[in-house]
Amino acid sequence: MANNTILAMNALQSNIIREITPLSDKDCFYIAERYKTEFTYPIHNHAEFELNFTEKAAGVRRIVGDSAEVISDYDLVLITGKDLEHVWEQHDCHSKEIREITIQFSSDLFFKSFINKNQFDSIRDMLEKAQKGLCFPMSAILKIYPLLDTLASEKQGFYAVIKFLTILYELSLFNEEARTLSSSSFAKIGIHSDSRRVQKLSLIHISEPTRLRCLSY
């Protein structure tokens, strides 16, 4: 069984499409709401971050990196790995009323001086965790559903951005319950230190040699 899985993953990797998304440099995000009877788009990756929601799609197989799962009626996944391939396959879904909402946004939306503020701690942690793909629990979906349900029809661009940021914040409160999908090695994620002191040292230009005693403070 393990060998079959590896062969299947290798076959998928050889067919990965590098998607050029419709996101404009002048837009904060791109959103597409689709009603469909089947999933046909092939496995792909792209540079932009993506939040993907599916409704009435029980039986669809979701593949993110080396993770493959058959989803239920509701599914919400955040992907921030720039080379992390993903696809939703029809598999065993017989629904004729599938709804899909895809939101793509650039990492540049959160410039460093902004995302590193204390108030964005939970969002920053969520975006980092989502480099391997992040699947949210039903409780999170229910929490943000009213916002997500109306985001595509929001006429005022500024309020749409505020609504989108609110969605990200509300989802970030479920960091502990959300599941990562792909393995670190497959998602090409390096091991980072959890120490905020070490992270801060890596961001600050140090004019003199750093001594070990500095880390003890």
Predicted regions, residues:
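Short glycine-/acidic-enriched loop or helix-start segments at secondary-structure transitions
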Residues: 63, 88-90, 216-217
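A hydrophobic/aromatic-rich effector-binding and dimerization subdomain
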Residues: 3-12, 18-23, 80-147
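Positions in alpha-helical segments
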Residues: 146-149, 199
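Generic protein-terminus/edge-of-domain signal
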Residues: 1-78, 83-86
